[in-house]
Amino acid sequence: MAILPLSISHSLTSALSATSSGIGRPVARLLHPRVPSRPTVICLAAPPKVPVPIASPASLGDDPSKWDPAECDALLRGGEQVASVLQEMLKLMEDMEMDGSFESLAVELIAQGVIGKRVDEMESGFLMALDYMIQLAEKDSDNERKSLLEVVKQTVLDHLTKKCPPHVQVVGLLCQTEKKDSRHELLRRVAAGGGVFKNDKGLKCQIPGANLNDIANQADDLLESMESRPTIPDRKLLARLVIVREEARNMMGGGLLDERNDRGFTTLPEAEVNFLSKLVALKPGKALERMIKDVMQGKAEGADNIENANAGPDSKLNHLTGISGRGSVTGLKPRPVRPGMFLETVSKVLGGIYANNTSGITAQHLEWVHQTTLKILQEMAF
């Protein structure tokens, strides 16, 4: 007679009931207004400088009347697949005899088997539905159900990561590595051709070999994709990606004038230049550090422009002043100051100063701004 641990059986049954009870409901009842932002992973074996396969789509929002019907439909279809996966896991576990001490390992192995044969057929809303169910488990204070669903989610992400190009896998690993020294060691191993790497938690993993320039470009592409949105749903991920890009570029050894880091800008972004001109006018110190920190956290000049999130590209600038109090050069409303673009602007200005051999107090000031910004982002990221 098969023996199924009560706790796991209860968790699976609870998760299934939570899914099946929601799938048949109207969309407005199925979806809670507080749907969390959910990571989407789409891995394409493509050369660098393409849309990066790691992103966090914006939340559906708090107003059900404004939800995108396509996303609602994707959530429903994803929920059906989650229910199917959990049902198959429950069936397999009922046929097994497990010792209590091996429950967690058994769940992981079963999840690997069930998801491994389904990962290529998963709907785009699968991870979205998983995140919604994890949120429901948190709301119900059901830690066992939450842990089970998180195992399923992590297994899906692991399978998708393996299908990514090497430099994409490395970006994901770097975003999960908290210690700066560990990230540098990981980059050195990757540049040397890959091998076994021991992470912050003491676990060993096999890492692929990849080009540092590809890694920096991939992180930069993702930053560009995230920062081009009216709102930033995940500033922690954004901060991690900025750090990954800057550390990969720094390890390449080309310096500020390295042509490999050139995005091809003909002009610098207006919002970032306006903010930088304010910083240069003040002495380095705690007050200046607070200004930078506020903007990096999405306050002051870095605040998301929620009111005009849906405004067209021709929205005019009413009262915004340009550099040194002059009117805006373009006449268009600039985006908020974004961390990745801000550091890019600082680097370009510094590069111009060094190229013209005019380094002095301004260059030292900008170097301080660059290092202080990286320190603040490190604190935000982990």
From Swiss-Prot:
- Recite the UniProt keywords alphabetically: Chloroplast, Plastid, Transit peptide
Quote the transit peptide annotation as a residue range: 1-44
Q: Name one GO cellular component term.
A: chloroplast nucleoid
Q: Which cysteines are joined by disulfide bonds?
A: none
Name its cellular compartments: Plastid, Chloroplast stroma, Chloroplast nucleoid
Q: What is its main location?
A: plastid
Q: Which residues form a coiled coil?
A: none
- What name does this protein carry? Protein PEP-RELATED DEVELOPMENT ARRESTED 1 homolog, chloroplastic
Q: Which organism is it from?
A: Oryza sativa subsp. japonica
